[in-house]
Amino acid sequence: GNVGSGTVEELAKWVEYMTSDGDSPMANLRRKNGRDKAWKLKYLGVGNESWGCGGSMRPEYYADLYRRYSTYCRNYDGNRLFKIASGASDYDYKWTDVLMNRVGHRMDGLSLHYYTVTGWSGSKGSATQFNKDDYYWTMGKCLEVEDVLKKHCTIMDKYDKDKKIALLLDEWGTWWDEEPGTIKGHLYQQNTLRDAFVASLTLDVFHKYTDRIKMTNIAQIANVLQSMILTKEDKM
């Protein structure tokens, strides 16, 4: 859901449009557009990266917005939303603490983003041209995710001892410079065995924390960052 530049009314109407089977303006608009039966929608992210590109917000401000926006995202006709708050970027433990304290069980899940990346300014390095030092640095950065998870989980445990709020690491993976000759900003990168080892080691860590982690999503499935599939026109 667009919390950064959208309104509460807009998000509420999108939820109604997708999930209501009733006789209402938004459900009728969906029918007019060719879809009679409502969709089943489970996961609803209320904002994304609200600390950065999703609004450059303070955690206290976002927590108040989450409470407001999520209140109007209603359950229609047997569809129950699993509402997810926009969580921290890697080492921002204050963000998690503020949201757990101020939002608490108004959210079903809290997201977290962690990338194996050299930094956010300048070159991130080649996806395919690297030396032994680059390789071992990448493995070390990848394995740091365990310490990050432990610290976020400890904060969540302080406010939610029964672990009813899920942690969802919904963006993770390697991030390199775009492949030469591709469109800048489209984040098209090749994979090597280095990336495969990052995926394997990261998944191994995730399996240790399944009491709290209920979803993880590599970024992304096709043609962007550590993707499973690369396509070009009709070729895969």
Regions found by a protein language model. Give the residues of each.
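N-terminal catalytic cores of secreted or lumenal carbohydrate-active enzymes
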Residues: 1-133, 150
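Alpha-helix capping and helix-loop boundary segments enriched in small/acidic/polar residues
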Residues: 2-5, 56-64, 98-101, 136-143, ...
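Extended, hydrophobic alpha-helical segments in both membrane/secreted and soluble proteins
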Residues: 10, 14, 69, 111, ...
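Short, well-ordered loop/turn and helix-capping segments at boundaries between secondary-structure elements
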Residues: 17-20, 75, 112, 154, ...
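Short, well-ordered loop/turn elements at secondary-structure boundaries
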Residues: 40, 105-106, 162-163, 209-212
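Solvent-exposed, flexible loop/coil residues
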Residues: 43, 119, 139-143, 201, ...
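Glycoside hydrolase catalytic-domain groove-lining segments
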Residues: 64, 68-71, 75, 79, ...
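Aromatic/acidic polysaccharide-binding cleft in carbohydrate-active enzymes
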Residues: 114, 164-236
